[in-house]
Amino acid sequence: MNPTATFYMANGKKIVVELLPESAPNTVASFIWCAGHGWLDNHAIQRIVPGSWVDLSYEAFHHKECAYLIPNEFTLHPEITPLESHPGCVCMGGYGEMGLAGCEPFFPLRDCPEHKGVYPVFGKVIEGMDEIYRLEKVDTKPVPFPYPGVVVNEPLQPEIIEKVVLDLKGREYLEPVRMPGDKKPATWNFD
């Protein structure tokens, strides 16, 4: 059995994700490492692009401990065939050549063939797609973003993830493989 992550929302709803370690082992390990430390708890969802995705964070969940990059999953594991990105998946965001975010998951709201092999699918939603579609429709406002051409809209009323609860099915997961060096995206400003 695969591990699961349950996102408990402040409105009483929940989103349950089956994690897919066979499809994206390092990405799953990274998500588990961050969620297991509680760094995703009490977080306001930061970016909603209707018709495209619900992006939980682009600032490493406001935790320095989450502000690390991991290698492209399919460079690290070339034997794995990337999964298709579509509604019902959860993917890990990233920063191009710099690498993948250690923990900046997003839920696609459309088929995203351009993500295959770039932003790994590391889980599938097994409960709570109605909540993801509700989030797509909340009122948002545009916010400045340091990367030209990237649309960032945050909810007018905060949509809070109260906590993320992991069920690892009795397995242990090691810390993720991280990118060497100290390059960081412009969005990770903790000063």
Residue locations for each model-derived region?
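Cyclophilin-like peptidyl-prolyl cis-trans isomerases
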Residues: M1-D191
